[in-house]
Amino acid sequence: MSAVAIATLVIAAASMAAQSKPNFAGKWTFVPDSTGAIAPIGRGVGLGQEFTAVHDDKTLTVAMKDPQLGELKSVYNLDGSETRNPINFGGQTVDRASKVKWDGAKLVITTTISMGANVAEATQSWALDGSGNLLVETVSSFAAQSMTTKATYKKN
């Protein structure tokens, strides 16, 4: 195989890999399922009823309003390096340290939430379905208990 053919294959493969990563930018609204479930908020990782995402080559920035905490903004580095997005809850600082990785077309955000000696972990997976809806699955664990929530968001 010639060097030109190999170079063409490498460029094509890189281009296809880049295309498989969706862009999550936009304003998103929770879509209730048939059970009437409410939008997941909790343990510092839920996205609530509505949120806005700004997504560029380097970061994903998520802004939402929490009924107890007010406006929350989290910035995630897409290169896998850790980001810290502390929040103030009841006069105490809750540290949130996150790392992001791509699993094909799925964005996976793993966050460690620390408040004093209490530590929890949450892994949130973001993916677009065939209709362009955002599917978010969150697995949270604290004190040997695990909880999984699934939510669908529609882009406004």
Model-derived features: positions:
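Bacterial N-terminal signal peptides
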Residues: 2-13
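Hydrophobic small-molecule pocket/channel-lining residues, especially in calycin-type beta-barrels
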Residues: 17-156
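Generic secretory/membrane-interface signal
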Residues: 1-2, 73
